[in-house]
């Protein structure tokens, strides 16, 4: 039973809840674009951008690992919404979701093969199959798993420290991003295709921590839906306020690794281990801080809902825009395209990120004026269901006028 809001203020409607999730999803994609474009440009330059570059450090501190983690949280939310709707329409929602993931895996494989090895779709698809075991679990069970995974994530650096003490001559595994992207920076497009999967094997070999973090955030998204935090959000203002306070404190604690970096304390082994613990959990705390901050703005400053709507179009077409940003970025920056990475610094990379996001925002706005789904979203839906339920044309469901007050 949904609790009704008493007193002043209007409850957040179903339409507004949909908009809120689209806002967060669109904002997360902006962060992903910025981080990925810095990664591509860095790879071409051999990761030699000045370490004291302020903008580069800001992106590293406040964006890297945060937005892809936020996207993972939203994937878990989307899983629950999909399964709840599918359960009302088909006898086996598990099979339908498995089919949906298989199609997403196909998109990821094509993305890796023809565009960029830094793909997350394939990892989402593979990790997503694990979610099927949690759909019918209680919120309490899911929470226990989340706590266990977080505790293990905090303890991992301790185990690493002990291993390093025992194996002082331990070898250092090559950094995935440096190896894969730098190896492609000087290749032609056809050469890049032929060697990309070799690099993918290297990435898969060291992907446990990535899948682990993704799955943790998937479960957190599942938990939020099971607890109905996105239903009647107005009535749950106190809950969202507590979530924001806890997330803010946790984020500030993990971001204290910045101080260790600024004062070069991380060169000491003890401080280095502490910095590792903080850094490995920065994605979790950062993503929850950003998401809960948007919730606070959405709930406590309703006059800002209109301006926040600029993110919704990209959020509704997140799959299409994600694939387009990779295509545009690799063509712009890598040497088989325009090779602009050789000629720009951090400020230029940041401006290109914003410019591409603006292009994607404009494209999404124009497209959704005529159609209900983005092009890749429509294909995904068609392949999942075998047909498109309802008209693919734009409908009043996603009208923005109702919340721009």
Swiss-Prot record:
Compartments reported by the entry: Cell membrane
Keywords carried by this UniProt record: Cell membrane, Membrane, Transmembrane, Transmembrane helix, Transport
Keyword Transmembrane helix: yes
Topological type in the membrane: Multi-pass membrane protein
One GO CC term, this protein: plasma membrane
Family annotation (InterPro entries): Bact_Transport_Assoc, DUF418, HGSNAT_cat
The keyword Oxidoreductase appears for this protein: no
Regions that span the bilayer: 20-40, 62-82, 103-123, 146-166, 205-225, 243-263, 282-302, 321-341, 348-368
Coiled coil start-end: none
Family annotation (Pfam families): DUF418, HGSNAT_cat
First-listed, main subcellular location of the protein, grouped into a coarse class: membrane
Role played: Involved in transport.
Family annotation (PANTHER family): HYPOTHETICAL MEMBRANE SPANNING PROTEIN (PTHR30590:SF3), INNER MEMBRANE PROTEIN (PTHR30590)
Protein name (record): Uncharacterized protein YrkO
Source lineage: Bacteria, Bacillati, Bacillota, Bacilli, Bacillales
């Amino acid at each position: 039973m949904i609790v009704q809001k008493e007193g002043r203020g209007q409850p957040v409607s179903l339409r507004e809840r949909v908009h809120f999730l689209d806002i967060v999803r669109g904002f997360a994609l902006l962060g992903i674009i910025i981080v990925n474009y810095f990664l591509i440009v860095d790879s071409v330059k051999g990761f030699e951008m000045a370490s004291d570059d302020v903008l580069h450090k800001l992106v590293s501190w406040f964006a890297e690992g945060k937005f892809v983690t936020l996207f993972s949280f939203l994937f878990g939310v989307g899983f629950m919404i999909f399964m709840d709707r599918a359960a009302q329409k088909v006898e086996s929602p598990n099979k339908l979701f498995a089919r949906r993931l298989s199609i997403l895996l196909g998109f990821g494989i094509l993305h890796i093969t023809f565009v960029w090895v830094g793909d997350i779709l394939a990892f989402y698809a593979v990790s997503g199959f694990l979610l099927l075991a949690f759909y019918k679990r209680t919120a309490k069970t899911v929470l226990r798993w989340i706590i266990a995974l977080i505790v293990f994530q905090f303890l991992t650096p301790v185990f690493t420290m002990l291993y390093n003490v025992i194996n002082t001559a331990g070898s250092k595994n090559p950094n995935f991003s440096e190896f894969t992207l730098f190896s492609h920076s000087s290749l032609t497009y056809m050469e890049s295709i032929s060697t990309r999967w070799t690099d993918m094997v290297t990435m898969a070999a060291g992907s446990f921590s990535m899948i682990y973090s993704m799955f943790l955030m998937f479960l957190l998204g599942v938990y939020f839906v099971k607890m109905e935090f996105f239903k009647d959000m107005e009535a749950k203002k106190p809950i969202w306020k507590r979530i924001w306070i806890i997330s803010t404190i946790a984020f500030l604690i993990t971001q204290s690794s910045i101080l260790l970096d600024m004062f070069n304390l991380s060169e000491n082994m003890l401080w280095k281990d502490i910095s590792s613990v903080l850094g490995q959990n920065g994605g979790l705390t950062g993503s929850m801080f950003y998401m809960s901050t948007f919730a606070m703005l959405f709930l406590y400053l309703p006059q800002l809902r209109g301006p926040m709507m600029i993110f919704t179009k990209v959020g509704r077409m997140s799959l299409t825009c994600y694939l387009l940003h990779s295509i545009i970025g690799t063509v712009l920056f890598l040497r088989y395209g325009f090779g602009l990475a050789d000629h720009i610094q951090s400020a230029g990379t940041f401006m290109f990120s914003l410019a591409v996001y603006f292009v994607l925002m404009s494209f999404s706005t124009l497209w959704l004026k005529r159609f209900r789904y983005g092009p890749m979203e429509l294909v995904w839906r068609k392949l999942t269901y075998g047909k498109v339920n309802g008209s693919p044309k734009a409908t009043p469901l996603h009208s923005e006028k109702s919340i721009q007050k």
